[in-house]
């Protein structure tokens, strides 16, 4: 990562008690609320946060494929990403884990061109971490891109805990990768099928 990233924590292996996977959007930041604002400004559709019963933006906001693509393109503009509010308690939770000796790995499914602005957002909001991974979670990107981590590479990481909001990703982490998953309570994941590794 950029040497100017002041919130990246120096990793001390002897202190390591397990790496923690921490999703970015809607785990550390209020991304869905920003997306709803974009949907309203572009298409005049008002969607309440608690009514977002699906992770898929097309279903949650009644958008067609083209409209959803427009929303995501606008949402990934630097000014919109930098304007996302951090989740309440996100900073204190990360600090407690770091103080306990955990390595914090921020994992996001954002496109590779958003890496720098994502790092900047973490820095601006004083969110400590050791590493950030841009993962092709949903098969959207060219996996040979030098900044993209594949799911196969991700499953070989030694995470003691993964914190997610996306139901499909939480299921994959538990069933395929065998990680213990803390599923953050969100309207779009409340109907997730139970799994012994998801809590």
Description of each model-found segment:
Residues 29-32, 37, 100, 113-117, ...:
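Short catalytic/ligand-binding loop motif for oxyanion handling, primarily in non-cytosolic enzymes
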Residues 76-106, 111-119:
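Short, acidic loop-to-helix structural element flanking the phosphoryl-transfer center
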Residues 81, 103-104, 129-130, 160, ...:
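Hydrophobic anchor at the start of a short beta-strand
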Residues 112-163, 167-174:
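Substrate-recognition "cap/lid" segment bordering the active-site pocket of phosphatases
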Residues 158-199:
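Acidic, Mg2+-coordinating phosphoryl-transfer loop and its flanking beta/alpha structural elements
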């Amino acid at each position: 990562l950029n040497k100017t990233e002041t919130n990246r924590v120096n990793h001390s292996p002897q202190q390591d008690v397990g790496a923690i996977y921490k999703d970015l959007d809607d785990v550390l930041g209020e991304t869905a609320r920003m997306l709803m604002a974009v949907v309203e400004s572009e298409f005049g559709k008002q969607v309440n946060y608690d009514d977002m019963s699906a992770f898929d933006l097309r279903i949650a906001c009644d958008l067609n494929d083209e409209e959803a693509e427009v929303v995501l393109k606008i949402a990934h503009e630097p000014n919109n990403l930098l304007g996302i509010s951090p989740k309440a308690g996100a900073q204190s939770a990360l600090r407690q884990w770091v103080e306990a000796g955990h390595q914090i790995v921020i994992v996001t499914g954002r496109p590779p061109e958003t890496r720098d602005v994502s790092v900047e957002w973490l820095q601006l909001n004083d969110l400590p971490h050791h590493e950030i991974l841009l993962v092709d979670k949903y098969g959207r990107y060219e996996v040979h891109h030098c900044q993209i981590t594949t799911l196969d590479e991700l499953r070989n990481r030694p995470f003691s805990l993964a914190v997610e909001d996306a139901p499909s990703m939480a299921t994959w982490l538990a069933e395929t990768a065998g990680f213990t998953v803390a599923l953050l309570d969100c309207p779009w994941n409340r109907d997730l099928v139970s799994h012994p590794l998801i809590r």
